A protein has these predicted regions:
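Mg2+/Mn2+-dependent nuclease catalytic core
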Residues: 1-99
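Generic detector of bulky aromatic hydrophobic side chains
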Residues: 11, 32, 138-140, 148, ...
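Hydrophobic/aromatic-lined pockets within catalytic cores
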Residues: 18, 42-52, 107, 111, ...
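Mixed-charge, glycine-rich, non-catalytic linkers/tails in nucleic-acid processing enzymes
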Residues: 57-62, 93-155, 159
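Accessory alpha-helical DNA-binding modules that contact the DNA backbone or grooves
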Residues: 147-149, 157-174
Length: 174
């Protein structure tokens, strides 16, 4: 990673095997790695505030690595063989927008969330998604969904179907 600027870059350490893409360089979006990529983007933005320059890449040092390319499996047992590369300008450009939207959402919840209602939901984001397991919140979701006749209770109707219904003035399956 070369540039004309002298600056710091983020290298995070994870005690896990790095799942690399077929190029053997960039990290796959598997398991927790989407979250790790977002985490490193936030670290990179914080670093940018300090040094006035945003590095285009961040790295993860894992305990080992592996990837599959052209019918062959490759792997290494040393954490120093390869770093997992996160490229915010090319391969992982979507991470930048995802983090930006997540930060906007957190700020919106902090500033306006106290005014919202879940019974009935006052925003589309507050409707339950019955197609997803939410652990300990499943009973609460089910209660709300039953009360409002949520569209995602219908077999094969997810959030996209609910959004289509909302656009056509349909708020319930009843």
């Amino acid at each position: 990673y070369k540039t004309d600027h002298v600056h710091y870059i983020v290298i995070d350490i994870k005690f896990s095997t790095l799942p690399l893409r077929a190029d053997g360089i960039h990290l796959l979006n598997s398991g927790n790695y989407n979250f790790y990529k977002a985490q490193l983007r936030i670290y990179t933005e914080a670093l940018q505030e300090l040094q006035g320059f945003t590095p285009s890449k961040a790295f993860i040092l894992g305990r080992r690595w592996n990837y599959h390319s052209k019918g062959e499996d490759f792997s290494g047992l040393s954490c120093f063989d390869k770093l997992g590369v996160i490229d915010f300008e090319k391969v992982d450009i979507n991470v930048v927008d995802t983090v930006k939207k997540a930060i906007e959402w957190v700020r919106l919840v902090r500033n306006e969330g106290k005014e919202w209602s879940i019974d009935p939901p006052s925003r589309p984001e507050l409707y339950p998604n019955m197609c997803v397991d939410s652990g300990e919140w499943n009973d609460v979701k089910k209660e709300i969904a039953n009360k409002i006749g949520d569209i995602t209770q219908i077999w094969y109707c997810g959030i996209k179907n609910r959004e289509i219904g909302f656009l056509n003035g349909i708020k319930t399956w009843r």
